[in-house]
Amino acid sequence: MAPNLSKAKDDLIGDVVAVDGLIKPPRFTLKGKDLAVDGHPFLLDVPANIRLTPASTLVPNSDVPAAAAGSFLGFDAPAAKDRHVVPIGKLRDTRFMSIFRFKVWWTTHWVGTNGRDVENETQMMILDQSGTKSSPTGPRPYVLLLPIVEGPFRACLESGKAEDYVHMVLESGSSTVRGSVFRSAVYLHAGDDPFDLVKDAMRVVRAHLGTFRLMEEKTPPPIVDKFGWCTWDAFYLKVHPEGVWEGVRRLADGGCPPGLVLIDDGWQSICHDDDDLGSGAEGMNRTSAGEQMPCRLIKFQENYKFREYKGGMGGFVREMKAAFPTVEQVYVWHALCGYWGGLRPGAPGLPPAKVVAPRLSPGLQRTMEDLAVDKIVNNGVGLVDPRRARELYEGLHSHLQASGIDGVKVDVIHLLEMVCEEYGGRVELAKAYFAGLTESVRRHFNGNGVIASMEHCNDFMLLGTEAVALGRVGDDFWCTDPSGDPDGTFWLQGCHMVHCAYNSLWMGAFIHPDWDMFQSTHPCAAFHAASRAVSGGPVYVSDAVGCHDFDLLRRLALPDGTILRCERYALPTRDCLFADPLHDGKTMLKIWNVNKFSGVLGAFNCQGGGWSREARRNMCAAGFSVPVTARASPADVEWSHGGGGGDRFAVYFVEARKLQLLRRDESVELTLEPFTYELLVVAPVRAIVSPELGIGFAPIGLANMLNAGGAVQGFEAARKDGDVAAEVAVKGAGEMVAYSSARPRLCKVNGQDAEFKYEDGIVTVDVPWTGSSKKLSRVEYFY
């Protein structure tokens, strides 16, 4: 039963709160029948059973000052039930962006203006700020509506259809777990910066729930700085040691050795239910990709393909790391429940398991049809009792650690909500499994050696991220459309970009975003590579063995298996937040990020397909796949998050290889063909002053790299032997580009005079490879 808050707290609704020692009214109030923020109504005709509680009454301001900007929504129900669908008010003529589950496992972006536009299984909504100052308190701020968990219940939002009502959906997942009184199922937060809005809100929710840690409290695993290779598209389930070895060798021979090797599905010991456990037969060679969901795990040890290698999996990993020194990290795949179909009941050496029939909630029934879900529902899941979940992860991970494995990709995470009926509901089952996973990861994989996948739901974010610090933020990279649409080779790539960019706004508070692998020989490979380069996350490919575009890969990876990574994770620019970059025929997806001494903008034409509300699936929308024009400005970069900032910028177009000077409020026009891109390095111009002249200077970076600005690791101006000098520390090798308002008298690289070119304000000089990304080159410009 949900906790019944005291009458005293109910009496505080709409009362004053203390902020920095001052008594102020709460920002959210019930104004007559309307829910308002700073006096601006945004949800109309709120039902009488809705309860509003200032966040500061549940989360003291002294702990989290941001609580002063928030409130919790709850309700009283006439009867205790395991699932409630409750209207919270009408939303009309107010632009919103949202994140909703379009598949069981995955979420994406959705926009609208009315309650009827809200999608099923919405995990987050942001209402746009108003553009008028009709109120004494100024324009309406951005408002975040964040469904969370309360007791054993989990919340989401959906459309009420009639009269533009928005509904709060609260469900336990078990008919035995019921409640009728709720006070904190949805969190509301107000703010003037949409990016700070989300981060501040998550800090309040973190203090309120105490069930997760924010990404700002954690460190991502070292693979985020590695160039990686994943075996999935190369082998699918047929992965084997010799093939993995050959794949690494071919990349190394081409000058792009991986620092990460991810052995995906296909290494485990599994069988079908009709296989005789006593026969010793294994099922991996009797199934195929897309058909493995009915299979179940029969032992923690690797299957015969790896077991028969001299020394088993451990021997293979040791020899591979010794032969290829750049390979510092080896990860393997496994499902949250062990395998797609869980564990085989009665398998010796495994904790006891019971086959449970999954049940889809009404919300999940309205998601996109998924063959993987269908197969799991039809065959059930061999579920370990939650009280013994620790044994599952300890047995699996201890063996992997002993074999030299550095981390795991944990997939099929959002399965638990379908099998929770007999286990206290979705929240309690998730807590038990995530606690076991967290404990094991801390013991065996340095506390953060995990990639979370198929995890796009607030249950995981709010309950499973105590230790997990890296997770996929998009649906799988589909090289072709599994439904057979030949145009899917292209429009699905635009969908992938949009999934990742907008999901990061929400998920980035909990986990570092991972934009998934791609193939370097795909028709849209450069489109993908550009997004990965500035995503701020790991960069890894799933190329078939020996099938590589090395010219493209060398723009991503350094010769020692590392990458040039941005300082944070990429997010959509403000002017894209409430727009539709997939099927409005006019919006260009723009994302921003920062490097140490510059900002970066990525512009992508993703138009051409996406979610269809009518068909309940992603579909081609070829009519929108047209050239798109947009404007890009230094102001698109959120400089308060890093990169330097300033009033004058040297903007370098990585693909066009041109430079333009812009002030902060100036912009430049970009036109992109479908599924093409441009990357802009936005480098603040710094004045280098000498008695004789003033010089404007901005280090751009390595023009041969997609994240050119990521190469600049240090920058300072100094006087040397009477000369004015700009000194830049460079990571990587290639053509170093800088803006200079005057021609340098001399350039030096690592103390040696170097030839350089100067044309139209651009200085270029070649920088050699030092042998290690840890050893930076020193480039000096003398005036």
UniProtKB/Swiss-Prot annotation:
Swiss-Prot/TrEMBL keywords: Carbohydrate metabolism, Glycosyltransferase, Transferase
Nucleotide-binding listed as a keyword: no
GO molecular function: galactinol-sucrose galactosyltransferase activity
Catalytic activity reported: alpha-D-galactosyl-(1->3)-1D-myo-inositol + sucrose = raffinose + myo-inositol
Entry's pH dependence statement: Optimum pH is 7.0.
Enzyme Commission number(s) of this protein: 2.4.1.82
Classification via InterPro entries: Aldolase_TIM, Glycoside_hydrolase_SF, Glycosyl_hydrolases_36
Protein activity control: Inhibited by Ag(2)+, Hg(2+), Zn(2+), p-chloromercuribenzoate (pCMB) and 1-deoxygalactonojirimycin.
Temperature-dependent activity: Optimum temperature is 45 degrees Celsius.
Keyword Glycosyltransferase among record annotations: yes
Role noted for this protein: Transglycosidase operating by a ping-pong reaction mechanism. Involved in the synthesis of raffinose, a major soluble carbohydrate in seeds, roots and tubers. Specific for galactinol and p-nitrophenyl-alpha-D-galactoside as galactosyl donors. Able to utilize sucrose, lactose, 4-beta-galactobiose, N-acetyl-D-lactosamine, trehalose and lacto-N-biose as acceptors. May also act as a glycoside hydrolase.
Family designation: Belongs to the glycosyl hydrolases 36 family.
This protein's name: Galactinol--sucrose galactosyltransferase
